[in-house]
Amino acid sequence: MRIEEDLKLGFKDVLIRPKRSTLKSRSDVELERQFTFKHSGQTWSGVPIIAANMDTVGTFEMASALASFDILTAVHKHYSVEDWNAFTSTASEDVLRHVMVSTGTSDADFEKTKQILAQSPALNFVCIDVANGYSEHFVQFVSKAREAWPTKTICAGNVVTGEMCEELVLSGADIVKVGIGPGSVCTTRVKTGVGYPQLSAVIECADAAHGLGGMIVSDGGCTMPGDVAKAFGGGADFVMLGGMLAGHEESGGKIVEENGEKFMLFYGMSSESAMTRHVGGVAQYRAAEGKTVKLPLRGPVEYTARDILGGLRSACTYVGASRLKELTKRTTFIRVQEQENRVFNSL
């Protein structure tokens, strides 16, 4: 047993220090980035935000809506091959280039993903997703996927420490997914005692991945546009959002009605709700590590997307970053004990 004494930080523990700026308007900020990925060799340009691969967020409808903002969607793994065929036959190539195909690590997952990728050459992203990215089996699957799809850009996770981030990059991941337990409907930290504050995880993993030519996506922990800015400021190349994009018309959650008001269900992918829906219930040997919440309906996702992008542009103007790419270099974090004046929050 050992204890690490240095303090680890989440998004709520810091603010970004403002700096002198020559920017005259938020409209001067360029959010689009261009990446060339280490292993696939593919070049992609767009806004590096990703809708999470949850079945109440990462839907075909969400992908179609967010593509117009140049935002990616990691489409959840529970669509059938037939569902994918219907989608790829009608979606434009521009939409498909903003889509990640999500997969687990079983042999059946591998075969299914192979069939999906064969449907369109525009499907260039694969998201290999497990809750615990520290297993040898997972690393071996990433290597297998890289060998099978040498020209596809592979995103793999989740991990939170530098050494495992390096392992995944060396095994074939172009992008490492960072985050254990920070999600709004994730209960891993309270069920297991395992986790890592998200901002510190991002800073550590970005340093590790960038040293090898890899990239990271910060997955989880963002509750407001300012958190997205902090994730980019901490070194994330991409930011994945779940709860912030849930509850919309495109989110795919079940709608329930209580006292005349409509709500949409949103749940973690290790929750009892998710396991009951997809595998028939919680296995006897495990515990659910997610919760289910009811969100008031939030309308079309376009308004939320504009709010997030607007907040990000504003953050860049406060530190003098004319491009999102510059935000990390322009960021100085200050530790704080409060984020906002909450006097009217209960109204």
UniProtKB/Swiss-Prot annotation:
A GO MF label: metal ion binding
Positions that bind K(+): G181, G183
Record InterPro entries: Aldolase_TIM, GMP_reductase, GMPR, IMP_DH/GMP_Rdtase_CS, IMP_DH_GMPRt
Pfam families: IMPDH
EC code: 1.7.1.7
Role this protein plays: Catalyzes the irreversible NADPH-dependent deamination of GMP to IMP. It functions in the conversion of nucleobase, nucleoside and nucleotide derivatives of G to A nucleotides, and in maintaining the intracellular balance of A and G nucleotides.
Sequence similarity: Belongs to the IMPDH/GMPR family. GuaC type 1 subfamily.
Protein name: GMP reductase
The gene coding this protein: guaC
